[in-house]
């Protein structure tokens, strides 16, 4: 894979991952309710789910790419539209409140329940499914080993996801007051939304 293309992929992956979603809200809540170990458990469960989704998506993509090169162009357009859609969705997002049941940290929790919840959120989240199906093909070089590129992009995505979730979990412990401010979350939504739209427009020129 071309190095500059890989950097572009990392950039899109980063902004896709750090945008607020179910997995991030779970990491924040686990950090607020429990501790960083709970955040780690749910985060590991999440990236395992992401790997399974990427494998399923890649099997279908690889088969299609061998048949039709024009399909790649179609996916490129879909991928760009998807990024723009995410941007608009982020900007108009109204779900900016994190509700806490109690105002203290729980020292005891069910680790299996934490893991299961993180895994379930990952495999039922449409965002990574659409990402792996629509964004992956944009960066694949048919002249090189598809499997090698797949593992490189997948594990890069998983690594960024793990770091992102752990960071949100850590920040929820150290900056609890900030995360509970609706204005702060609204600003974050708008900034990430505009970045998605810009990336979607730029994707059409790759």
Explain the meaning of each model-derived region.
Residues 3-73, 134-153:
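Juxtamembrane transmembrane-helix termini in multi-pass membrane transport proteins
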Residues 13-17, 122, 126, 158-166:
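Residue-level hotspots within the lipid-embedded alpha helices of multi-pass solute transporters
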Residues 37-113, 171:
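Membrane helix-loop-helix hairpins that form the core translocation module of multi-pass transporters
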Residues 7-12, 81-84, 117-120, 156-157:
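Short alpha-helical transmembrane interface motifs in multi-pass membrane proteins
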Residues 66-98, 161-171, 176-206:
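Selective transmembrane alpha-helices of multi-pass membrane proteins
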Residues 111, 116-118, 123-128:
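Selected transmembrane alpha-helices and immediately adjacent juxtamembrane segments
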């Amino acid at each position: 894979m071309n190095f500059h293309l890989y950097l572009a992929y990392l950039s899109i992956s980063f902004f896709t991952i750090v945008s607020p979603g179910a997995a991030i809200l779970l990491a924040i809540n686990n950090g607020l309710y429990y501790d960083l170990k709970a955040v780690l458990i749910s985060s590991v469960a999440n990236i395992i789910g992401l790997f399974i989704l990427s494998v399923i998506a890649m099997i279908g993509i690889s088969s299609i790419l061998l048949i039709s090169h024009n399909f790649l162009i179609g996916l490129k357009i879909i991928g760009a539209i998807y990024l723009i859609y995410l941007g608009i969705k982020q900007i108009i997002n109204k779900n900016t409140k994190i509700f806490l049941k109690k105002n203290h940290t729980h020292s005891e929790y069910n680790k299996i329940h934490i893991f299961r919840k993180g895994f379930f959120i990952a495999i039922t989240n449409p965002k990574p499914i659409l990402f792996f199906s629509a964004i992956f093909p944009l960066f694949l070089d048919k002249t090189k080993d598809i499997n090698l590129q797949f593992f490189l992009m997948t594990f890069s995505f998983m690594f960024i996801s793990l770091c992102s979730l752990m960071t949100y979990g850590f920040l929820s412990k150290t900056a609890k007051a900030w995360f509970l401010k609706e204005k702060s979350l609204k600003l974050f939504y708008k900034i990430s939304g505009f970045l998605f739209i810009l990336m979607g427009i730029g994707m059409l020129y790759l």
